[in-house]
């Protein structure tokens, strides 16, 4: 199970991520408002400015104070590390 740090010690499962987007556009703002009304919004910004909106496969919306590029980089870095670990395990066998 891959976990991604989304800032301030908050971690989400990488397997559940559908999209990581910027909160600037009107459609994303609408998605955030609808999630708030449905009780499906998780605010992980600790009162700071929202810089990334994470959409999960369970229709939860997670707000993060970390840039979308940073979250994506952490996701890609974690995947690369997992591949390297898998390769090393196969060599040991």
Swiss-Prot record:
Residues of the region (Disordered) are 74-93
* InterPro entries with a match to the protein in the record: RemA-like (IPR007169)
Start-end of Acidic residues biased regions: 81-93
Which branch of life, at top level?
A: Bacteria
Q: Where do the TM regions start and end?
A: none
Q: Which family does it belong to?
A: Belongs to the RemA family.
This protein's name: Putative regulatory protein Cthe_1316
Organism of origin is Acetivibrio thermocellus (strain ATCC 27405 / DSM 1237 / JCM 9322 / NBRC 103400 / NCIMB 10682 / NRRL B-4536 / VPI 7372)
- Lineage of producing organism: Bacteria, Bacillati, Bacillota, Clostridia, Eubacteriales
């Amino acid at each position: 199970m891959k976990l991604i740090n989304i800032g301030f010690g908050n971690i989400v499962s990488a397997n559940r991520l559908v999209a990581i987007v910027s909160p600037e556009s009107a459609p994303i703002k609408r998605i955030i408002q609808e999630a708030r009304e449905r009780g499906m919004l998780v605010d992980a910004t600790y009162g700071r400015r929202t810089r990334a909106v994470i959409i999960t496969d369970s229709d939860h919306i997670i707000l993060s104070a970390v840039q979308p590029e940073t979250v994506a980089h952490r996701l890609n870095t974690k995947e690369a590390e997992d591949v390297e670990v898998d390769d090393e395990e196969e060599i040991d066998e």
